[in-house]
């Protein structure tokens, strides 16, 4: 296929798609140019069904530093593991694409997005999401798209689609929404305490804009789209399924209705093991035993799936016996740990998170050097999910995509209420350790983070709580669930996380397993989430009503002084010599910004005070009219040099020593003598003249004797 180009304008910027020129051996490939951002997307599919009980989809988003005209950092000067932003963008693209493949599809699919040029005012992630959908749609991969995504901002009561950098900085909302022509199927958002009505309207505005992008994709597919390949879907043997359902469905239903998680898991596992043992023995000599046992496992999973959904939709009974809108038992604790700067333990049913606060000087902020201009990140929220939290063994190592994503969600939820840098000049790190998990651990980490911040004396604007909403839908009827547990998440159709304060929403995240959800479901879920959020905030505020007025004794104290910008080099010294000497002497940490704000951190107030004195002395300047207690350091015939302070000397001319005539300076002064002087002049070169006699009352002039006349 020769190169073909398709052009439109979207959100005020040119959107150009090129097909047929590059990556022609992939099943589908596109080059998307949005503004001056350029993204190459290639989609490929394995020829055979993969083993395993899941769909092996891999979406990558690769940031090439050359795209922004930068050299990679580090010794190797080559791109390494994906940045946090790249990982989050890959997840952002994966989530709306994944539901658009058929049930039982098991071929491996890879979608690789490479950023070739970067324009900070034209969203490369949105170009990559568009390119991913289009590459799959024009390929022979059986993808039931297209989908598209947009960013939505909110400034002065107006919604803005794909805002540029300046607009995003002024926006009260940072929303990414994706979906198909019919419905929304992915949401990711941070917001500055916006109402449910505004958030819902933003979602609908975003979905309207998505229609333009989908229509554009459909035009391209009509011209260059390939015929979809016939692939084998994972389907179980119908006779085997009927046999197992008839014999064991009642037993499995009974096991599913056990309320306590561990007991329920044990009961369902016992039934499954009994069934597997029977059929493994029955077909032991069959050459297709592996396929049969795979089908048995899949049938049992489908039976459990069907019973959980039936209980909720028909009987309105949840696996643990709760009502549809009921939250599990809550508990909130502060000061769980000594020595740390703040800690909070939050428990919701069998989900538990411990959050630990650490405060540090601003010099500890994380420097982010990606495709965007380098910047410093003041607030970090890290989420850890050890396998013991679900009673299992498993991999331990660096944070995976899921942990990075959950940490980022908590970060967005909490950063909206943090004090400004001027109010609270600290770098802030929260670490969420998930100790138990039965669903919604990311929201528990938000609640625990609120407790830790307030216990640590961080003056947040308001406490934040999070809740996860679920959905069971048969296409006609649906049920929205409050505070979903693991089983409801696994067998349900939606995981909709909502975090916020009493004033409004600070973060949203939605993933679904069906093609999309309607505005009615979104509205109902947001309303139920608000009610639940307020219930959780009641528990948090009963434990700690407001941030403590003081930091923990172990937290670094801070004081700030302002110096002239031209004095920064004086405090730092040649090669940092002066500031290093101060730090070595006092044991403090010092940060100096470009405006001359000096922040001094230490747990010892006396050390802070001493540091302030040293710095004040370094930057101090003599002023005309001020009086100084000085020390004579040198004597010359024409006067004496005195030290006013630190490295600032002044000349007391011989004529300024006394009102009477001074013949020899050494007759009046000696080196090391303390004298009081007044600065009377500073010339253009900074040389200081001082006077001793200016501080002495001038003696009266002698009266003239009257002449006698004869």
Curated annotation (Swiss-Prot):
The keyword Nucleotidyltransferase applies. It is an enzyme of class 2 (transferase). This is Polyribonucleotide nucleotidyltransferase. Mg(2+) binds at residues 489, 495. Residues 700-710 have a biased composition (Basic and acidic residues). The keyword Magnesium applies. GO terms for cellular component: cytosol. InterPro entries: ExoRNase_PH_dom1, ExoRNase_PH_dom2, ExoRNase_PH_dom2_sf, KH_dom, KH_dom_type_1, KH_dom_type_1_sf, NA-bd_OB-fold, PNPase. Residues 625-693 form the S1 motif domain. Residues 691-710 are annotated as: Disordered. Pfam families: KH_1, PNPase, RNase_PH, RNase_PH_C, S1.
């Amino acid at each position: 296929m020769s190169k073909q180009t398709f052009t439109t304008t979207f959100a005020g910027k040119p959107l150009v798609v090129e097909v047929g020129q590059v990556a022609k051996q992939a099943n589908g490939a596109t080059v998307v140019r949005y503004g001056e951002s350029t993204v190459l997307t290639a989609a490929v599919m394995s020829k055979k069904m993969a083993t395993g009980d899941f769909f092996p989809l891999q979406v990558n988003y690769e940031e090439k530093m050359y795209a922004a005209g930068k050299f990679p950092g580090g010794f190797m000067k080559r791109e390494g593991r994906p940045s946090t932003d790249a990982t989050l963008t890959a997840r952002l693209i994966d989530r709306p694409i994944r539901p658009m493949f058929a049930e039982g599809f098991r071929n491996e699919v890879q979608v690789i997005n490479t950023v070739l040029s970067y324009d900070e005012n034209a969203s490369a992630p949105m170009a990559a999401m568009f390119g991913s959908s289009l590459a799959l749609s024009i390929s022979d991969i059986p993808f039931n798209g297209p989908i598209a995504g947009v960013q939505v901002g909110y400034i002065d009561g107006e919604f803005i689609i794909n805002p540029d950098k300046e607009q995003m900085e002024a926006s009260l909302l940072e929303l990414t929404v994706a979906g198909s022509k019919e419905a929304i199927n992915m949401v990711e958002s941070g917001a500055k305490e916006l109402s449910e009505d505004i958030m819902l309207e933003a979602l609908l505005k975003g979905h309207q804009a998505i229609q333009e992008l989908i229509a554009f994709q459909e035009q391209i597919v009509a011209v260059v789209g390939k015929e979809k390949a016939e692939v084998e879907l994972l389907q179980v043997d119908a006779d085997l399924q009927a046999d197992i359902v008839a014999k064991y469905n009642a037993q499995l239903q009974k096991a599913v209705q056990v309320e306590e998680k561990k007991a329920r898991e044990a009961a369902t596992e016992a039934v499954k093991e009994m069934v597997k043992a029977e059929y493994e023995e029955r077909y032991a000599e069959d050459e297709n035993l592996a396929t049969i046992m795979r089908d048995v496992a899949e049938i049992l999973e489908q039976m459990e799936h069907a019973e959980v959904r039936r209980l909720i939709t028909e009987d309105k009974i949840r696996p643990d016996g709760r009502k549809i809108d009921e939250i599990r038992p809550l508990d909130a604790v502060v000061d769980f740990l000594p020595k740390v700067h703040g800690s909070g333990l939050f428990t919701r049913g069998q989900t538990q998170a411990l959050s630990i606060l650490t405060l540090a000087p601003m010099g500890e902020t994380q420097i982010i050097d990606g495709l965007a201009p380098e910047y410093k990140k003041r607030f970090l929220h890290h989420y850890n999910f050890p396998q013991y939290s679900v009673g299992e063994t498993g991999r331990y190592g660096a944070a995976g995509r899921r942990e990075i994503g959950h940490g980022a969600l908590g970060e967005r939820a909490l950063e909206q209420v943090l004090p400004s840098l001027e109010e609270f000049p600290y770098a802030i790190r929260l670490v969420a350790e998930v100790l138990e998990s039965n669903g919604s651990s990311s929201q528990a980490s938000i609640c625990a983070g609120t407790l830790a911040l307030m216990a640590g004396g961080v003056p947040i604007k308001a406490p934040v709580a999070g809740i996860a909403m679920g959905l069971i839908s048969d296409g006609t009827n649906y049920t929205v669930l409050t505070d979903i547990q693991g089983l409801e998440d696994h067998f349900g159709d939606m995981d909709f996380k909502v975090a916020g304060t009493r004033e409004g929403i600070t973060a949203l995240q939605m993933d679904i397993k069906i093609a999309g959800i309607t505005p009615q479901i979104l509205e109902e879920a947001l309303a139920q989430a608000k009610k639940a959020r307020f219930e959780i905030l009641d528990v948090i505020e009963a434990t700690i009503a407001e941030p403590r007025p003081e930091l923990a004794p172990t937290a670094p104290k801070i004081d700030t002084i302002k110096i002239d910008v031209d004095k920064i080099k004086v405090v730092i010294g040649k090669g940092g010599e002066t500031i290093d000497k101060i730090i070595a002497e006092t044991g403090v940490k010092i940060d100096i910004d470009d405006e001359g704000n000096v922040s001094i951190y230490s747990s010892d107030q006396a050390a802070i005070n001493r540091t302030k004195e040293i710095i004040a002395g370094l930057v101090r300047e003599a002023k005309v009219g001020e009086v100084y207690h000085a020390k004579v350091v040198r004597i010359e015939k024409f006067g004496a040099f005195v030290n006013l302070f630190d490295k600032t000397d002044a000349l007391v001319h011989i004529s300024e020593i006394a009102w009477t005539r001074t013949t020899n300076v050494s007759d009046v002064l000696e080196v090391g003598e303390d004298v009081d002087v007044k600065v009377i002049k500073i010339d253009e070169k900074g040389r200081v003249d001082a006077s001793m006699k200016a501080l002495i009352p001038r003696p009266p002039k002698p009266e003239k004797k009257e002449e006698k006349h004869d």
